[in-house]
């Protein structure tokens, strides 16, 4: 590797809006403020909700439902 052409790789502090603080390595050179992290994101906490209440197939089946069928 060539010398003196690579950015400095330093330890910084990433602070989430939920209060979680993480020490990470980065070339950014300054501390970061995060909106979400793995401690408060709905996908990782299991508190996610289903936003899609029906797709195109459900709309088709609803529109062309045959009387007497399931």
Swiss-Prot record:
<dbReference type="GO" id="GO:0005840">
    <property type="term" value="C:ribosome"/>
</dbReference>
<feature type="binding site">
    <location>
        <position position="18"/>
    </location>
    <ligand>
        <name>Zn(2+)</name>
    </ligand>
</feature>
<feature type="binding site">
    <location>
        <position position="40"/>
    </location>
    <ligand>
        <name>Zn(2+)</name>
    </ligand>
</feature>
<keyword id="KW-0689">Ribosomal protein</keyword>
<dbReference type="GO" id="GO:0046872">
    <property type="term" value="F:metal ion binding"/>
</dbReference>
<dbReference type="GO" id="GO:0006412">
    <property type="term" value="P:translation"/>
</dbReference>
<dbReference type="InterPro" id="IPR034704">
    <property type="entry name" value="Ribosomal_bL28/bL31-like_sf"/>
</dbReference>
<feature type="binding site">
    <location>
        <position position="16"/>
    </location>
    <ligand>
        <name>Zn(2+)</name>
    </ligand>
</feature>
<dbReference type="Pfam" id="PF01197">
    <property type="entry name" value="Ribosomal_L31"/>
</dbReference>
<keyword id="KW-0479">Metal-binding</keyword>
<keyword id="KW-0699">rRNA-binding</keyword>
<keyword id="KW-0694">RNA-binding</keyword>
<feature type="binding site">
    <location>
        <position position="37"/>
    </location>
    <ligand>
        <name>Zn(2+)</name>
    </ligand>
</feature>
<protein>
    <recommendedName>
        <fullName>Large ribosomal subunit protein bL31</fullName>
    </recommendedName>
</protein>
<dbReference type="InterPro" id="IPR027491">
    <property type="entry name" value="Ribosomal_bL31_A"/>
</dbReference>
<dbReference type="GO" id="GO:1990904">
    <property type="term" value="C:ribonucleoprotein complex"/>
</dbReference>
<dbReference type="GO" id="GO:0019843">
    <property type="term" value="F:rRNA binding"/>
</dbReference>
<dbReference type="GO" id="GO:0003735">
    <property type="term" value="F:structural constituent of ribosome"/>
</dbReference>
<dbReference type="InterPro" id="IPR002150">
    <property type="entry name" value="Ribosomal_bL31"/>
</dbReference>
<keyword id="KW-0687">Ribonucleoprotein</keyword>
<comment type="subunit">
    <text>Part of the 50S ribosomal subunit.</text>
</comment>
<keyword id="KW-0862">Zinc</keyword>
<dbReference type="InterPro" id="IPR042105">
    <property type="entry name" value="Ribosomal_bL31_sf"/>
</dbReference>
<comment type="function">
    <text>Binds the 23S rRNA.</text>
</comment>
<comment type="similarity">
    <text>Belongs to the bacterial ribosomal protein bL31 family. Type A subfamily.</text>
</comment>
